[in-house]
């Protein structure tokens, strides 16, 4: 491969950092009418200003810095410009990831675009992608622009800080999927926590501090077991490089120890039953962009980690303890599904729905069958599109217009916002896993893989289909119909803006198009998953 193509992966990490530097170092001002004045052009509109002031109050109640020149020209801090810069940077990164996808050879199950960087730190950094990580890279670069669009108008204070955190999260998330060293994987895996902590702590709702500490403590304590397992691997093999570890065949006793440590860390990140309190609080209290990144990408880190650390390196332990994973997954599905039926908070309902679907793709990948593993990846990607769209609708449209997340306040929204209701209906069907959506293909293949291994638990896991239909249809029916709309929302609920429509229709097209043509993803996955199953069997026999 040409040398200039090899730099694409490095560019994926550098472009957001360049965007961070531009936003941090540049003062964005817009020239307005001559001072004094009382009206401003869009997007500032009416302001309140006094003579000699160095700040003014915008129409939404926020304050903006003012610069007065000798000619009485006035410059006001432009909060839209840095948002545009961040959005352009994220779109540019999406274009680079699409180039990597186009140039990727899916008939080769080895790592490609491999880069070695010796001069960036005291530690050698290896970057590369294979037929599995390429899809998670694409998912990340797709979701970040959606997250930036979601809070376009609702974030009015500390805008630069918010944008810097979002671009920093993109860099760290991409690094997790690109590094070829398990120690660096752990470092970037944990480096995501401080930005999330600050994001929720600064821009969250009323209980944001409590939620930020929950997510930090839960995931940090869980990841200590992952660090212990990685250090054990390193001491045994003398390396932390992926390719070298793939040639290992750990003793069964060591495999059990490593499996327990790694699975605990990923069970917290998925999350599973008894370990999901942090996710619910984080989703409910997080700003909309944080919820979208959390549901769309962060929850997929455990799925990716299972493919990197458990399935190829610990085959015998993962095969022998499959039934325990299945039991945990089934209990999580049933618990989360019942919890959705009793909650009155829309955001909390979608958070519980995420826990239920995460349990389905968890048991799918641990089925150790080609269908189950491929289905688990498909369902993870589908959830990465559907869940952010639902959060966008309830947090970026309904909540921004009404100021409440309580379900019983909403009814008859279809009368005021038919386009919003139509897209809400499409994503509710996708969340149910109906045919012609990517969710259906992923859920069907995941459950099929479970049926092949343990039919009884597969039957219990299939209850997720019934439960997801129950809470998704209930939510849509209650919000879109359910009688005449409340007079409280008569003047506040309006239909989708162009920004909201473009973001939601883009995700909707992806979910439906890939549901009709899933071979676009499955053909690329098949070589890597088949190779994984083959090496799996060889190591199991040798062990």
UniProtKB/Swiss-Prot annotation:
The chain crosses the membrane at residues 5-25, 84-104, 129-149, 161-181, 182-202, 213-233, 254-274, 287-307, 321-341, 350-370, 377-397, 416-436, 456-476, 501-521. The gene is ndh-4. It catalyses: a ubiquinone + NADH + 5 H(+)(in) = a ubiquinol + NAD(+) + 4 H(+)(out). Its EC number is 7.1.1.2. It comes from Neurospora crassa (strain ATCC 24698 / 74-OR23-1A / CBS 708.71 / DSM 1257 / FGSC 987). This is NADH-ubiquinone oxidoreductase chain 4. Pfam families: Proton_antipo_M. It is a multi-pass membrane protein. Keywords: Electron transport, Membrane, Mitochondrion, NAD, Respiratory chain, Translocase, Transmembrane, Transmembrane helix, Transport, Ubiquinone. Belongs to the complex I subunit 4 family. GO terms for cellular component: mitochondrial membrane; respiratory chain complex I. GO terms for biological process: aerobic respiration; ATP synthesis coupled electron transport; electron transport coupled proton transport. GO terms for molecular function: NADH dehydrogenase (ubiquinone) activity; ubiquinone binding. Core subunit of the mitochondrial membrane respiratory chain NADH dehydrogenase (Complex I) that is believed to belong to the minimal assembly required for catalysis. Complex I functions in the transfer of electrons from NADH to the respiratory chain. The immediate electron acceptor for the enzyme is believed to be ubiquinone. InterPro entries: NADH_Q_OxRdtase_chainM/4 (IPR010227), NADH_UbQ_OxRdtase (IPR003918), ND/Mrp_TM (IPR001750). It is found in: Mitochondrion membrane. PANTHER family: NADH-UBIQUINONE OXIDOREDUCTASE CHAIN 4 (PTHR43507:SF1). Its main location: mitochondrion.
